[in-house]
A protein has these predicted regions:
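Short, well-ordered beta-strand segments in beta-rich or mixed alpha/beta enzyme
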Residues: 30-37, 67-94, 134-143, 173-200
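Structured core of small recognition/catalytic domains
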Residues: 150-228
Length: 228
């Protein structure tokens, strides 16, 4: 019986791996945000591996975006922002050799698990063709209690509309996590650090955060990055 139960658990673990992508809509752009934490002594090695997988991934069929980012205040933390034309393209990438080789090489220097969050877009916009060297990326994980999911979506869409009117906003998007509908990722690109500091003080931003507070299921987790 113990052997049989062990086999069931192993099978469930294997089956769970593609579930997050499988729960995404079959049509429409597929998005993925990945958080990576590396041993502090291995920052340079990780940056090199990220550049390699980015170069390979951008050549794959259906890739629309593959941004590799390094956190400004904790340089051993990285993020990947991906967009694929549809679920099929995202699944092909997830099962492909380039990503597998990247994960295999990354594993020995990881300080935490490979935190990959497939998502769908709820407030999206075209990516800029290029960004300046002073550009700052912000990624925020927003978690609300399940009854507040629809309200949060409406608020995120309004914040996106308001933010895109700011002169130094280069992109603002909100994604909804496939396997947890009450979890969201906000991705932003700003011309420079002063621009995002100004955005934080904007009336629309303060109004959003004030209203989000009572709805939240976790801390408002905003992280700032530079492009590699």
């Amino acid at each position: 019986m113990k052997v049989f139960c062990g086999m069931l658990i192993a099978a469930a673990t294997i089956a769970a791996a593609p579930m997050a992508l499988a729960q995404a809509p079959a049509s429409g752009t597929a998005y993925v945000v990945t958080y990576i934490e590396i041993l502090p002594s291995a920052q340079g090695e990780a940056a090199g591996l990220l550049k390699q997988v980015a170069a390979a991934s951008r050549k794959e069929a259906g890739n629309q975006r593959f941004d590799i980012l390094q956190r400004i205040d904790r340089k051993n933390q990285f993020a990947i922002l991906e967009a694929w034309t549809d679920l099929k393209a995202a699944e092909a990438h997830a099962a492909g050799a380039a990503l597998k080789q990247f994960k295999d090489k990354l594993k020995p220097i990881q300080a935490s698990f490979y935190d990959e969050r497939p998502s769908k877009g709820i407030a999206v916009a075209p990516s800029p063709s290029s960004v300046g060297r002073n550009a700052v990326f912000a990624i925020t994980h927003v978690d609300v209690t399940p009854p507040n999911t629809d309200g949060c979506i409406a608020m995120l869409k309004k914040l996106a509309d308001d933010t895109r009117k700011e002169t130094k906003s280069e992109q603002f998007e909100a994604w909804q996590q496939n396997n947890r509908a009450n979890h969201f990722t906000v991705t932003e690109i700003w011309k420079d650090r002063a621009a995002i500091d100004s955005h934080v003080m904007a009336a629309a931003t303060k109004d959003f955060r004030e209203k989000l507070g009572p709805m939240s299921g976790a801390l408002y987790d905003e992280r700032l990055y530079k492009s590699l």
